[in-house]
């Protein structure tokens, strides 16, 4: 078989001439510069040098509004349309006093804080709201009683958000991320697995299923559900697609079934989102990295993250392939 490789020099001395070359010789550069592509077969090789220019595909981003939380780090957020037709947002907190803040964001130029929920936790890392806009779930880490788990909140009226249940069975190691999909909460347990909790009666949550990799030293950071498929991000073990109700593999919330997976060398897989391209019929999962090459600064200065967005073609579930990646400026 042919063996393909490349080398290059970037236009900017501050950037490394990186890129990607596939087994069929398709090449894409991450930064502009001069690159040499080499194809080798046996004792012979051919090479071609080419100039790669930036596409300059840019768009200005305009700040419309700013909801200030000055005394604690904000962790995550979720925006939804309330049952009254107005737009709302809930934000979590990191390393604070276990607070979640609720906002009216109907006018993006004027974000209005409308309520606060405080729970026993140091960090409310993740916040999600059900599709019907009635139920919110927040995660807990660092609880004084070490039970952690999650908290279920009635947000039918976000101005009077009310806790209606807590759940910590099997989740005492801390819940870092959660997701709500069709009367079920998917909650990460201590970075090892996700438990699936039925909330058809949100006042009486009950566990109905779980999914955990059968791999040495496995861990998980996030899970996202769409069309009955759970997309989990598992650091070194990459992205896993699991049937939790879609039907393609016979999975249900109480009996999740793996569909496909893909891992990449860095092992930084932190989040994943599905995308179907209607024009081409291709199905992709965009996998995001989490990396802090200069360390994590939480006290006296900014933290500069790094890493890539990986575009993985899952059209052929048996042969997923990474087709491109984008380096996040850092």
For the regions a language model picked out, list residue spans one by one.
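Extracytoplasmic soluble-region selector
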Residues: 1-57
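Feature marking well-ordered beta-strand scaffolds used for ligand recognition
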Residues: 33-34, 47-330
């Amino acid at each position: 078989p042919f063996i393909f490789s490349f080398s290059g020099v970037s236009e900017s001395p501050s950037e490394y001439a990186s890129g990607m070359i596939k087994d069929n010789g398709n090449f894409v550069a991450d930064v502009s510069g001069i690159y040499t592509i080499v194809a080798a077969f046996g004792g012979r090789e051919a090479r071609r040098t080419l100039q790669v220019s930036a596409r300059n595909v840019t768009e200005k981003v305009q700040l419309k509004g700013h909801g200030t939380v000055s005394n604690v780090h904000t962790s995550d957020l979720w925006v939804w349309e309330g049952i009254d037709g107005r737009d709302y947002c809930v934000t979590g907190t990191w390393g604070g006093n276990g607070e979640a803040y609720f906002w009216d964001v109907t006018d993006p130029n004027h974000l209005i804080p409308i309520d606060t929920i405080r729970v026993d936790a140091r960090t409310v890392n993740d916040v999600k709201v059900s599709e019907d806009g009635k139920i919110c779930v927040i995660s807990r880490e660092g609880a004084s009683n070490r039970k952690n788990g999650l908290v279920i909140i009635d947000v039918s009226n976000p101005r009077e958000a009310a806790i209606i249940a807590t759940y910590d069975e099997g989740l005492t190691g801390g819940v870092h991320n959660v997701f709500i999909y069709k009367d079920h909460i998917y909650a990460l347990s201590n970075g090892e697995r996700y438990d699936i909790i039925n909330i058809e009666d949100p006042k009486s949550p009950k566990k109905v299923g779980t999914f955990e990799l059968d791999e040495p030293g496995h861990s998980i950071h996030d899970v996202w559900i769409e069309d009955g498929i759970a997309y989990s991000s598992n650091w070194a073990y990459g992205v896993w697609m699991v049937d939790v109700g879609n039907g393609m593999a016979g999975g249900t919330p109480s009996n999740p079934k793996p569909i496909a997976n893909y891992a990449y060398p860095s092992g930084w897989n932190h989040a994943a989102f599905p995308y179907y391209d209607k024009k081409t019929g291709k199905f992709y999962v965009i996998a995001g990295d989490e990396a802090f090459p200069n360390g994590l600064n939480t006290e006296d200065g900014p933290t500069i993250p790094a890493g890539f967005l990986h575009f993985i073609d899952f059209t052929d579930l048996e042969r997923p392939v990474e087709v491109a990646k984008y380096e996040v400026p850092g």
